[in-house]
Curated annotation (Swiss-Prot):
Condenses 4-methyl-5-(beta-hydroxyethyl)thiazole monophosphate (THZ-P) and 2-methyl-4-amino-5-hydroxymethyl pyrimidine pyrophosphate (HMP-PP) to form thiamine monophosphate (TMP). One of its GO terms (biological process) is thiamine diphosphate biosynthetic process. One of its GO terms (cellular component) is cytoplasm. Gene3D superfamilies: Aldolase class I. GO terms for molecular function: magnesium ion binding; thiamine-phosphate diphosphorylase activity. Belongs to the thiamine-phosphate synthase family. It holds the Pfam family TMP-TENI. This is Thiamine-phosphate synthase. Binds 1 Mg(2+) ion per subunit. Mg(2+) binds at D70, D89. Pathway: Cofactor biosynthesis; thiamine diphosphate biosynthesis; thiamine phosphate from 4-amino-2-methyl-5-diphosphomethylpyrimidine and 4-methyl-5-(2-phosphoethyl)-thiazole: step 1/1. 2-[(2R,5Z)-2-carboxy-4-methylthiazol-5(2H)-ylidene]ethyl phosphate binds at T134, G135, S136, G165, I185, S186.
Amino acid sequence: MEINYGLYLITDRRFLKGRQLKKVVEDAILGGVTIVQVREKDVSTREFYNVAKEVKEVTDYYKVPIIINDRLDIAQAIDANGVHLGQKDMHLNIAREILGKDKIIGISVGNVKEALEAQNNGADYLGIGTIFPTGSKKDVDAIIGIDGLSKIKDSISIPSVAIGGINKTNFKDVLKTGIEGISVISAILDEDDIKLAANNLLINK
C-alpha cells in the first residue's frame, strides 16, 4: 500500500462529545484525512481491541491505512497496517522482528539524534515534535518549534509528519519545511464539523 502521510489523524475519544468514533473517523476521512492512528491510554486490552476493530472497519472501507499506537498485540490482532512507537515503547528492532518487514513502524522523535537513530534502525516514518504547545499531550519535554522541525527534517531521508499544536492557523508554516504531513488530534476532533475541520487542513483544496 502506498502511504500518503499528508493529513494524519490520531484518535482521542475524549473529544467525541457524545459522537460515535466510527462516524467521526469517517467524516475526517471524507474531509481529507489520509492515515489514522488509534491511540488509547488507560483502557483494558479488550476495550482497545474493540475500538481499533471498529475504526478499522471504516479505514478498510475507504482504503486508508490504520496505525496502532504502542500496542503491537492490538496491531497484530486486527491486522493493522503498522504501529507507532514512542521513545520509551518497544524497541524498533524487536518490533520489526515481531511484526515483519511488511508492516509500517513509525517512531516519535524530538531531536536530530533520535531521528537518525530511528532512521538507521529501519523506521518507515517519523513523528517529529512537539512543534507547538498542546493540550493533548501532557508529558512534553520540549517544544522544538519550526526551527527544530526544519533541522530534524533536513537530517533525514525517510518520510515524516509533524505533531503538536498544529491547527488551521499554523499548518501552512509547518508544511513549508517540506515535511510529508501533519499529525493532528484536537484540530479535527475538537471541532463541531469534522469534515470541514479536516478540509481546512488541506494545502491544496
